[in-house]
């Protein structure tokens, strides 16, 4: 066994089991009633949430296989796990047609698989009498896929989303949740180019969200018309009309890889801890920046430096990052910035300095003189800095299963703290 003398520990692990998720309120299945004065200004009780007595627990079936490996007297410890988790009867909110009188209903919807691996490596890099340095690196890679949805006659039994009639007579379906597709996708318009000439404006596609305001003449051209400085959006189905049928896949809000690196240094009574974490493989629709660009005149936002990259008369459109800027996008800019589009879709990968802390434990000889068993002083900072391409407050602002935006949500707080722990 001399060949593997450097292996100090090896342990294989495996498990298989089922767990239930009962994250259902006591009365969610029974519906809700609310008091309203909508009926002739008289108080009345109305049904505000549809009951669903068939609502059940989620059931997750998971397989885990892995091993722990210790090397060089456990100076290096490695752990790797493979997991395959299938969640059935997924609890979700399903959008209902307006004719139902309700917006949505809490229901069980289909089957989803989460599959990937976790890895962790801990190393004791330096071990001396007065100085030590230890590191721990973790990483998780996971992909998800919708396996089964209730039969509804649509392509892939798609729930929600859009059905678009293409010019060749075929139907293209996208958005919502569909079998064989991952969760977390979001859609929007894609810019074709910035209109910079009267000829381009005259030949622009009819845009159902445009009010047709011409800022050069201060006149309305008519609903659907475009003018110089506006975006020309790409036409998905080729009908020369821009509407909800022209939504493209812009990205996925769920990172496929997350992890962190923790380093701990000790020197006599001092302990320095530095923790970094990261997320990779996802996108964000930057609603915070979008709000600043499209609705400045409401007085609730400040001007971002990004407006300096907007197109102006005489600029090379190929070098302009954004369409022409105005303080009133809805009326004067024909909704160039208000609608979801690739203009504000950004790669959301980040590396964050999550925490740095410094502790100092006073020597026992000194503590004995003042009658204390322990005294530890701490200085710490959290959420100190992001390395990311996301413009604005934080790449972690705003996320959900179908959309990721940063409008009106609070970012992780950057904070600094001091502490003193006394043991009597």
Describe each region flagged by the PLM.
Residues 107, 124-251, 293, 311-317:
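Conserved small-residue
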Residues 23-36, 153-157, 178, 182, ...:
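Membrane-proximal, glycine/serine-rich, low-complexity loop/turn segments characteristic
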Residues 72-76, 126-131, 256-290, 365-367, ...:
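Subset of outer-membrane beta-barrel
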Residues 279-376:
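Extracytoplasmic gating/loop element in the C-terminal half of outer-membrane beta-barrel translocons
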